[in-house]
Amino acid sequence: MTFLKKLEHAWSASQSLLQVGLDPDPKRFPRELEGKPDAIFQFCRDIVDATAPYACSFKPQIAYFAAHRAEDQLEALCQHIRAQHPDLPIVLDAKRGDIGSTAENYAREAFERYQAHALTVSPYMGLDSVEPYLAWGDRGVIVLCRTSNPGGSDLQFLKMADGQPLYLHVAGLVADKWNANGQCGLVVGATFPNELAAVRQRIGDAVPLLVPGIGAQGGDINATVQAGANSAGAGMMINSSRAILYASTGEDWRQAAGEAARGLRDAINAVRT
């Protein structure tokens, strides 16, 4: 099954557009995990199990694992998700961008080692830096477009010769040329709802959006759904990380994470209907 088909199935089966971001910070873990050598895996595994009923996908951020030499724990986590929650796609957030031969190895890392269903990439080096990921025809390639950070405007809002901003040029390039196999998506932040709406208008319904910026970054759920949903009321993975992961650091942290995920899913669905 292709990434897009798997995602469409998850949207329908879970009735959710919520993507749970997995950005583990051991300094914020509950006390019961202190000193455990596989604490990152245990924390993320239990978050996954608590939130899976309310999610359409999971997004582990590779730097949070690599910084703690926990790549093996990330690998184990991806194996757990695929085994216990096989209907939910894994989007590996790595934002890779390099020349073809290096990209080939990044693709193998994401799609062979971690068995991710999709990967975030940077478009800055052009098509030949993205083609090694597109060669994996059943996997998703999620391209940075209009990111949620304020500094994104330094480049992404620059005007092209035809007057359109760079982020819209990227959106059009991906939708019209790079997405020939129907495997591309775009990263567009919830913190810029006007730009989110412009991207959706430019790309139509077929290209899914990964939308960070809800919760701690200040993105508004109502504005996000209204701007970014496709004509079927879907088409988005609305990511939340910290608001779910650290809903509680007490003994109820698993339950609190599940309740936070359910609340976000329901808040998103209230706008869809």
Curated annotation (Swiss-Prot):
One of its GO terms (biological process) is 'de novo' pyrimidine nucleobase biosynthetic process. One of its GO terms (molecular function) is orotidine-5'-phosphate decarboxylase activity. Keywords: Decarboxylase, Lyase, Pyrimidine biosynthesis. Its EC number is 4.1.1.23. Disulfide bonds: none annotated. It is an enzyme of class 4 (lyase). The active site is at residue 95. The keyword Lyase applies. Pathway: Pyrimidine metabolism; UMP biosynthesis via de novo pathway; UMP from orotate: step 2/2. CDD domains: OMP_decarboxylase_like (cd04725). It comes from the Bacteria. It catalyses: orotidine 5'-phosphate + H(+) = UMP + CO2. The keyword Lyase applies. Pfam families: OMPdecase (PF00215). Belongs to the OMP decarboxylase family. Type 2 subfamily. This is Orotidine 5'-phosphate decarboxylase. The lineage of its organism: Bacteria, Pseudomonadati, Pseudomonadota, Betaproteobacteria, Burkholderiales. The gene is pyrF.
